Regions:
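Short, Asp-centered acidic motifs that coordinate Mg2+ and/or phosphate
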Residues: 96
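Hydrophobic/aromatic ligand-binding patch that stacks against planar heteroaromatic rings
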Residues: 22, 119-124
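Electrostatically charged, flexible surface regions
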Residues: 41, 145-247
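Short glycine-rich anion-binding loops that position phosphate/pyrophosphate groups of nucleotides
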Residues: 9, 38, 77-78, 102-105, ...
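A cross-family phosphate/adenosyl-ligand binding-site feature
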Residues: 3-6, 13-15, 19-93
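Hydrophobic/aromatic beta-strand patches that form the interior of the parallel beta-sheet core
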Residues: 31-33, 72, 129-133, 170-172
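Glycine-rich phosphate/pyrophosphate-binding loops
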Residues: 124-149
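Glycine/threonine-rich flexible loop motifs
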Residues: 105-114
Length: 247
């Protein structure tokens, strides 16, 4: 099984390396291609970091613990990396794309803005099965994230993911703790776990602030179940027409 590992936190992310090791240890043929710099919040954007989409810089990297696994630092956002992989830029096009492990949850309809999820959705448009993996690390948490917990939960889905129809996408969120049970299937919350507020400063700029949302979460939604300490998995669909809309 040819597998691409990517993310939006960048090629140096420990979460990326942990996910790559998990996929390799599962017996999959793994290649890692991730942004040379952090590209969080880029959605499925097809943007090259240098602004020239005709040429994208790619640098081979060596990562401890991933001997024998090709690792590429790519001057591009994760959506473009997934597209490049589908076109054979890093070897045979992947049958499976794993995106993550993201430092922080990706829940609710706010996944639209996630580079982690955006890479998975882009890959699905090109026939790959994709899994986005995120660890629910609080923004102010200074302890070491439990990457191994996320890998263990994700690995429990690997075989099921591989058996899904081409183009399938799963979004997995895992609580940041030493152990977690298998994920519960969940619907998308109306919003993510973070709400953005804007304020006109009067000096020609707009001030942005982020606030964690913990109240009024829809029961059974991914954000609500994750807040209760459960891992969640949500099946996503990429861009599709709406034939029922009357206009």
């Amino acid at each position: 099984m040819k597998v691409l590992i990517t993310n939006d936190d960048g090629v140096e992310s420990p979460g990326l390396h942990a996910l790559a090791r998990g996929a390799r240890d599962h017996g999959w043929d793994v290649v890692v291609a991730a942004p040379a710099e952090e590209a969080s919040g880029t959605g499925a954007g097809l943007t090259a970091a240098a602004g020239d989409t005709r040429r994208v810089a790619v640098e081979r990297r060596e990562v401890p613990g991933l001997a024998g696994v090709p690792v590429y630092a790519v001057a591009a956002h994760p959506g473009l990396i997934a597209l490049l992989a589908a076109q054979g830029a890093f070897g045979e096009p992947p049958e499976v794309v794993l995106s993550g492990i993201n430092l922080g949850a990706n829940t609710g309809r706010a996944v639209l803005h996630s580079g982690t999820v955006g890479a998975a959705l882009t890959a699905s448009l090109h026939g790959a099965r994709a899994l986005a993996v995120s660890l629910d690390v609080a923004p102010d948490d200074e302890t070491d994230p439990h990457w191994d917990t996320a890998v263990t939960v994700a690995a429990g889905l690997f075989d099921r993911l591989a058996a899904l129809p081409p183009g399938s996408v799963l979004n997995l969120n895992v609580p940041d703790r030493a152990e977690s049970g298998p994920p519960r299937r969940a619907g998308l919350a109306e919003s993510g776990t973070v709400q953005v507020h804007v304020e006109d400063t009067g000096d020609g700029t707009i001030a942005l602030s982020a606030e964690l949302v913990g109240d009024d979460l829809k029961p059974g939604s991914d954000a609500a179940l994750l807040a209760e300490g459960h891992a969640t998995v949500t099946a996503l669909r990429s861009v599709a027409e709406d034939p029922d809309l009357v206009w």
